[in-house]
Amino acid sequence: MGIGVAGKGREGSLDRQRFFIVGCQRSGTTLMRLLLGTHRDVHCFDEATAYAILAGVGPEEVPAETLRVGYKIPRWTNALLDAEVTDFGHPIRATDVYRGEAIVFMLRGLLDTVASMIKLRGRSQQTWLHTWGLPTVEHWIGHDKRFADTYAREIALFRAAAHPDLAAAALYWRHKTDAYFHYQHLGLPVIGVRYEALVSRPESVLRGVVGHLGLDWDPAVMAHERSDHPQISKAGLATGGTDPTRAIDIRSVDQWREFIEPSAVDEMLAIADGLVERVAAL
């Protein structure tokens, strides 16, 4: 199917105005922001403004006709239910962010997600994995006892790995992706969207997402590349180097073969510990 849906949550219901777009970084959250942002009744904030707005330190300007306001916040994916929400290397902290809103949770295969972490490079030409992924994992291990206890086996595998960078990336993906199944178990109003299904069967998947938000279908979401989008850089790109003029396609599916040594795959899958199959089954 490509999507998975849970209940209405501990507080509030699906008729709430706000919703959140979350998921492991490099899993397609920006694409989902662009797609839903073209819906006539939706306004979406990207990361450049979403975190500040939710922390109460940034201005929030929403068109009067908007029925749903989306916040793309992948940094906070695994921390939505925390009393204080923050992320390593990010200056913004917020309290009591989640109040029962609908959640759109992007899910992408382990290997392609990690490949995208390697593919994306910043101004220094360092990969996203080395700029953010590895330091974040080390921070979790050293400063988050809950993480260290929960993933003790996986941390040991990472420390012993022949390909430690890729093993760390797998652990990063594991922690972020585990949050979907945790939220689902709690009965929160979360819909899981597999990136691979979204790009291969966009209309059927997007109809499920739009319905989850309690909105009528708008065919405009199928042609986001023809729309003007807010929060686009001077270079014409959205967060993470996403080109808003690129139509939905499957070019990034199975890209991992260009970036990941086959000898590293078994180590990565051992850390994922069956989660790859659970995601693929959605």
Report the location of each language-model feature.
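PAPS-dependent sulfotransferase catalytic domain
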Residues: 81-82, 87-221, 231-244, 250
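C-terminal accessory extensions appended to soluble enzyme cores
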Residues: 249-282
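Short, flexible helix/strand-to-coil boundary loops that buttress conserved ligand/catalytic motifs
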Residues: 46, 117-118, 260
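C-terminal/domain-terminus segments
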Residues: 50-55, 198, 273-282
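PAPS-dependent sulfotransferase catalytic core
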Residues: 1-78, 123-135, 232-247, 251
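Residue-level detector of family-conserved "landmark" positions at structurally sensitive sites
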Residues: 46-47, 220-222
